Structures are given as C-alpha cells and as structure tokens.
C-alpha cells in the first residue's frame, strides 16, 4: 500500500478513511487528500485524488466486500493473491473518522454496538457462529459469508 511494517504474530489495527472532498477537508496543491491509512492509530499514508478524477457516482451493483484478497476494477478476484491473517472487528462508517476517533475505536472496539447513527455495518468476529453463510452484522441490516479457506480462532 505504499508503506511497509512488520507485524508477524502481532494484532494490528488498520483504518482506511476516504472522502472525495478531502479527508478532514485537507487539500494539497489544490487536490483533495482523498485517502488516509492509519496503522495502530498512527497516520501511515495520505493520498491525493487525481486532478482529472470523475466525481463519485454510487450504483446499485452488488459488489462483494472482501478481506485478505485483491480485486480488479470489475470486482473479480485477482488470481490467487491473498494474505493470511485474523480479523477481530470490521466496521464501515458513513463519516470520515478523525485520528482521535480512530484511536478511540482502536482502544475500545467493543464500544461499537450497532446503534451508532453513522455505522453502515459492523461485525465482531471473536467467536464462532452457527452459520458461516449468514453472519449478521451489528446493525441487523446486513449479513456476510465466509468463502475459501478459513478457521475460527476464538478470543485471540
């Protein structure tokens, strides 16, 4: 992703914040900083948008949300690219979180209940579920399924 870090046998909190108008309103050389990546609450990367970019247009296509694999622009898996790892919490928010908010969520992930007005969806993945094809999120609006090789690791 443009930076490297060693995390073998360590839990790492990763947060990606995007806003086409500029995360925190930040603009660099007249171009909005559209993406910031935080690792363990510290800013690791900030990227400007392209100056010739088109405005974001939402669509109603059902595009799979994936973790630990690469996707092409058409939402197809890229070969056999994948990463081994564990995931404990996954949250998608409507609002672009500040660094302080990211650090708070990193320190208290259990504080996310599903009733937050700007939470789109979220999963707490610290215990096995009864159906790997229908894992309900915290909001009760969405479900996920596990595809490929996986194993549940409880309370890690």
Regions found by a protein language model. Name each.
Residues 1-5, 77-78, 106-114:
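Short surface loop/edge beta-strand patches of beta-sandwich-type extracellular domains
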Residues 1-54, 150-156:
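Extracellular glycan-interaction surfaces
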Residues 10, 31-33, 62, 83-88, ...:
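Residues that flank catalytic or metal-binding motifs in active/ligand-binding sites
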Residues 14, 87-92:
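Extracellular beta-strand elements of beta-rich domains used
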Residues 20-23, 42, 71-74, 92-100, ...:
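Acidic glycine-/aspartate-rich tracts in secreted/extracellular proteins
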Residues 44-86, 114-120:
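Flexible glycan-contacting loops in extracellular carbohydrate-active proteins
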Residues 103-156:
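Extracytoplasmic low-complexity segments
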